[in-house]
């Protein structure tokens, strides 16, 4: 019998990332775990619908035995079974992030006995989670370089707080892993601004694009009007294509916050990224830790290592026989497998 791993959900960033990473790694390695103080660092601790959906999805995909899978629960025991490929559908029942549920189960399906398709309904444009376009345009091309082949499709938008969106991913088992090396970004090739609107006046998008264009030379300026029943909602994004990587940044609009302020938040975030030569942005760094650890080698450079990143590394090191090294030089941190 494999040893039980005990995790403290209050460590590091104290949010849902510890649970999601633990579920992924438990399914992959077959190691059971317990976690206490789930989301202790949040205003509303314990399992929310999004986290409970991730637990139930993991349970279905590998036939796990679970204790504590209830709304508001701050303790969970998870004993994984065998991961099975197939077609799966999960409904969050709120505007909780579809992509974070997918992030939990897809790594396990990289090791399944056949191809899979996973469809999740819930929120697609959430201020605290990567949107589907980030997964599709930024993360998945990098996963392909590692040898991981999956394809995400946004079937219907669902803005926070209404939800109602649908995201699906098709994934194939990994034949072999390659080493990812991401050092400096290189020269910028082009920058693309994009605004999504659903049930929001078009002038909001025009003002957001104007704010972006006032700070950056945009090669493309796209405004997409979505059906009203997919909103109300508004997301403004800026994609930076460089010689060695494509990064994408976004801000979700809020009620009673002007278009100019929303776009200015995005401008600030992109300028922070461009101020460093590092290829990898703060949020992408979180997503690369697990696939790089599974490959057993690789490195990337990030300007601003987040608490999420450090927490994710700590959880990965509990399940896998790998050790990460972080070396900071001139404001850039090199993250590598030692």
From Swiss-Prot:
Top-level taxonomic group: Bacteria
Entry protein name: RNA 3'-terminal phosphate cyclase
Enzymatic reactions: a 3'-end 3'-phospho-ribonucleotide-RNA + ATP = a 3'-end 2',3'-cyclophospho-ribonucleotide-RNA + AMP + diphosphate
Active site residues according to the UniProt entry: 308
One annotated GO biological process: RNA processing
Pfam families according to UniProt: RTC, RTC_insert
Keyword field: ATP-binding, Cytoplasm, Ligase, Nucleotide-binding
Cystine residue pairs: none
Gene3D superfamilies from the UniProt entry: RNA 3'-terminal phosphate cyclase domain, RNA 3'-terminal phosphate cyclase, insert domain
Cell compartment(s), UniProt: Cytoplasm
Main enzyme class: ligase
GO CC field: cytoplasm
Binding site for ATP: 103, 283-287
Listed HAMAP family: RTC
Keyword ATP-binding appears in the UniProt entry: yes
PANTHER family: RNA 3' TERMINAL PHOSPHATE CYCLASE, RNA 3'-TERMINAL PHOSPHATE CYCLASE
Family membership noted in the UniProt record: Belongs to the RNA 3'-terminal cyclase family. Type 1 subfamily.
Biological role stated in the UniProt entry: Catalyzes the conversion of 3'-phosphate to a 2',3'-cyclic phosphodiester at the end of RNA. The mechanism of action of the enzyme occurs in 3 steps: (A) adenylation of the enzyme by ATP; (B) transfer of adenylate to an RNA-N3'P to produce RNA-N3'PP5'A; (C) and attack of the adjacent 2'-hydroxyl on the 3'-phosphorus in the diester linkage to produce the cyclic end product. The biological role of this enzyme is unknown but it is likely to function in some aspects of cellular RNA processing.
EC number: 6.5.1.4
Molecular functions per Gene Ontology: ATP binding; RNA-3'-phosphate cyclase activity
């Amino acid at each position: 019998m494999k040893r039980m791993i005990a995790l403290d959900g209050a460590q590091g960033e104290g949010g849902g990332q510890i649970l999601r990473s633990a579920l992924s790694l438990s399914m992959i390695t077959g190691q059971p775990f317990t976690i206490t103080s789930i989301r202790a660092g949040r205003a509303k601790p314990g399992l929310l619908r999004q986290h409970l959906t991730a637990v139930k999805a993991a349970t279905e995909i590998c036939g796990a035995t679970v204790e504590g899978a209830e709304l508001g629960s701050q303790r969970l025991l998870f004993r994984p079974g065998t991961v099975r490929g197939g077609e799966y559908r999960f409904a969050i029942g709120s505007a909780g992030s579809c992509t974070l549920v997918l992030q939990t189960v897809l790594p396990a399906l990289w090791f399944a006995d056949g191809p899979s398709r996973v469809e999740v309904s819930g929120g697609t444009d959430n201020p605290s989670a990567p949107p589907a376009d980030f997964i599709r345009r930024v993360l998945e091309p990098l996963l392909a370089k590692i040898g991981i082949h999956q394809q995400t499709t946004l079937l219907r938008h669902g803005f926070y707080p209404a939800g109602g969106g649908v995201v699906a991913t098709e994934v194939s088992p990994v034949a072999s892993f390659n080493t990812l090396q991401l050092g400096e970004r290189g020269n910028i090739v082009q920058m693309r601004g994009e605004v999504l609107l659903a049930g929001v006046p078009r002038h909001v998008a025009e003002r957001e694009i104007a704010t972006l264009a006032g700070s950056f030379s945009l090669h493309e300026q796209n405004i997409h009007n979505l059906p009203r029943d997919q909103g109300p909602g508004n997301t403004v994004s800026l994609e930076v294509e460089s010689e060695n990587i494509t990064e994408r940044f976004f801000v979700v609009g809020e009620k009673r916050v002007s278009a100019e302020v929303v776009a200015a938040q995005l401008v600030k975030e992109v300028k922070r990224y461009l101020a460093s030569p590092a290829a990898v942005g703060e949020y992408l760094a979180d997503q690369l830790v697990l696939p790089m650890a599974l490959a057993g080698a690789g490195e990337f450079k990030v300007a601003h290592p987040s608490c999420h990143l450090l927490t994710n590394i700590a959880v990965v090191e509990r399940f896998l026989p790998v050790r990460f090294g972080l070396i900071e030089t001139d404001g850039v941190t090199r993250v590598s497998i030692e």
